[in-house]
Amino acid sequence: MSKETKPKVVVIGGGTGLPVVLKGLKKKEIHLTAIVTVADDGGSSGKIREQMDVLPPGDIRNVMLALSNVDPRVVDLFQYRFAVDGDLSGHVIGNLILTALSQLNDSYVDAINVLATVLKIRGKVIPATDQPLILNAEMEDGSIVHGESLIPLQGKHINRVFIEPENVKPYPTAVEAVKEADLIVIGPGSLYTSILPNLLLEELAEEITASKAQKVYITNILTQIGETDFFSDADHIKVIHEHVGKSFIDKTLINTTTVPKELLFPEDVAQVEHNAEEMEKLGVEAIYQDFLSTEDGLVRHAADKVADALLAMLPNKNNEKE
C-alpha cells in the first residue's frame, strides 16, 4: 500500500492497556499515532517528575517499547527496575534514559523522537501535553483527593476527576493527529487515571468530538479496585461522556470470553458486566467478541484480535503489513 493511502489511526490512553493494543496495531499498514497521558505521579515516574520537573516518563516508555522493533534484550534492559535499596531504588532504566534525553534536547518531544530512532519504533508517540498534569478527584462524600496515584486508594466512589492546571493546552501535534485521523481509539486502561486525563484537555476533547472519524472505546475486561468497582461496560462510556460534556463514542469493543476464576485476583476484582440495553440507549454500537488473552497468567486484551476488529472499521481493509 502506498504511503499516501495508509489510513491514520490515533490511539489515546496510558497505563498498561494501551501498549497491548499498540503491539497489534504496529503490525498493520497504517499511520499509527499514540497520544499518551502525563498525569502519572507514582513510582519511578513520580520521583523523576518531582525531582526533575519533567513529564513523567513511565507511560511514554511503555508505549515506545510496545512499538519498538529491537532485540527483546534491549526491551528487557529498558524495563529493568533497580532493587529496593540504594539511591536508584525503584527506578526503571528506560525512565532515566528518557529523562536524560529530555535534558540533552530542546523539548520532550525531541527526546522522544531521538529514542524512537534508537528503538526503531513503528508509529509516532506524542505526550498529551508538554507539562505534567495533577489529577484530582472529587469523591462521593465531597472530599478532594490530589494526585493520580492516591485516587484508587480511597475506597470510595469517584464523582468526577479534574486536572490542574485547568486550562493547559495539548501538544499541537496531538491536536493535528486527531484532526487528520481516520479512526480514533480510546483505551483500554484505567478509566479515571489513564483515559480521562487526556480527555480533560479541552482543546483535544473538542477535536475528538468534532472529528468525522469513527471513535471507538475499548472496554476494559476487568473492573479496577478504587476506580470502577461494579461498573458495567455501559457505565464506563457514561463516565467518559459526562466528563467530556457530550456523547461522541460511536462503537465499543467488548470481550465476551469468561476470565478463569483463578486469574481474578485480588478477590474483589471482577469481570466487567454487559449491559446491552443501556448501551443501546447510549447510541453506541457494541462489538461483542472474544478479545481475551491469558498468556503468562495475566488478563489482557488479545492484541491481534483487537487490531483486526479496529482495522475492519476502516474503508480500506487491505491493511496487513507487507
Curated annotation (Swiss-Prot):
> Which UniProt keyword terms apply here?
Cytoplasm
Q: Has keyword Glycoprotein?
A: no
Which cell locations does it reside in?
A: Cytoplasm
Q: Which GO terms describe its molecular function?
A: LPPG:FO 2-phospho-L-lactate transferase activity
Any one of the GO CC terms:
cytoplasm
- Major location (coarse): cytoplasm
Write out the GO biological process terms.
regulation of cell shape
The answer to whether the entry has keyword Iron-sulfur is no
Which Gene3D superfamilies does the record associate with it? CofD-like domains
Cite a single Pfam family from the UniProt record.
Answer: CofD
Q: Which HAMAP family match?
A: Gluconeogen_factor
The text of the family note is: Belongs to the gluconeogenesis factor family.
Q: What is the recorded function of this protein according to its Swiss-Prot or TrEMBL entry?
A: Required for morphogenesis under gluconeogenic growth conditions.
Protein name (database record): Gluconeogenesis factor
